[in-house]
Amino acid sequence: MTMTATMTTPLVLKLGGALLENETALEQLFTALSEYKSTSSRPLVLVHGGGCFVDELLAKMNIVSEKKNGLRITPFSDIGYITGALAGTANKVLMAQGLKSGAKVVGLSLADGGIATVTQSTAGLGAVGECEAGDPTLLTALLSGGFLPIISSIGIDAQGQLLNVNADQAATAICETLDADLVMLSDVAGILDADMQLIPEMNSNYAAELIAAGVINGGMEVKVKAALKAAASLNRDIKLASWKVPERLVALLNGEVEGTKVSS
């Protein structure tokens, strides 16, 4: 199944990178979403990170942030700050742009209505969560009512612990919850090869080769693995593309080929 095969299937857009601190780009994104919704009844869901806001806040607090294998290490003493940056500032910045565009926005975290199941990571990253599909009831009701859910990557486990979830992994879990399509928007056009050229199609074998060679690493490795997981569990292609070409966003949402297509 591909994105063009079922245009009534919910579409999850994962937003990341410098987009969240670029007001002009956000306005262009929501303008494109508004244009798309004027001609399509397809439900949309936004899932976001907000590393730029986390970095800015931690720097003001004189806290040094570290990453391990592309994932942010989150000391338990810092999770309150990170929750504020992601579920607070980042989420409300996106909600503000959505409201300006005329959308009926609802700000959520991964814990609301059990839309995702979050458990603490065992990778020695601190207050970091692993994310799996949850209960679709709340999201289905919101989408049926014409709302645009905007979901931060903050979760809460069964013990009530706040956890920071990688936004790519969070978006994958939300797709699994809704049986939705997924487009990951970031600063780059898609997955790039060793010569920094766009790779139009990617599968698990090719990804393993590029990861072993060090071509795909850090945050892109996390993103690619999340996309591969989604492609396998949903049995459909996932797209990685850039938000930097706003005039192509509507075409991308309509299923036209942009960026890198990831299949299992």
UniProtKB/Swiss-Prot annotation:
Record's subcellular location:
Cytoplasm
Source organism per entry reads: Moritella profunda
Q: Which SUPFAM superfamilies match?
A: Carbamate kinase-like
Give the molecular function GO annotations.
Answer: acetylglutamate kinase activity; ATP binding
A Gene Ontology biological process noted in the UniProt record is: arginine biosynthetic process via ornithine
Q: Its pathway?
A: Amino-acid biosynthesis; L-arginine biosynthesis; N(2)-acetyl-L-ornithine from L-glutamate: step 2/4
What does it catalyze?
A: N-acetyl-L-glutamate + ATP = N-acetyl-L-glutamyl 5-phosphate + ADP
Query: Disulfide bonds, which pairs?
Result: none
The reply on keyword Amino-acid biosynthesis is yes
InterPro entries reported for this sequence: AceGlu_kinase-like_sf, AcgluKinase_fam, ArgB, Asp/Glu/Uridylate_kinase, NAGK-NC
Site (Transition state stabilizer) at K14, K223
Listed name of the protein: Acetylglutamate kinase
The record's principal subcellular location, in a coarse class, is cytoplasm
In terms of Pfam families, this protein maps to: AA_kinase
UniProt cross-references to CDD domains, sorted A to Z: AAK_NAGK-NC (cd04249)
Its keywords, alphabetically, are: Amino-acid biosynthesis, Arginine biosynthesis, ATP-binding, Cytoplasm, Kinase, Nucleotide-binding, Transferase
Any one cellular-component term (Gene Ontology): cytoplasm
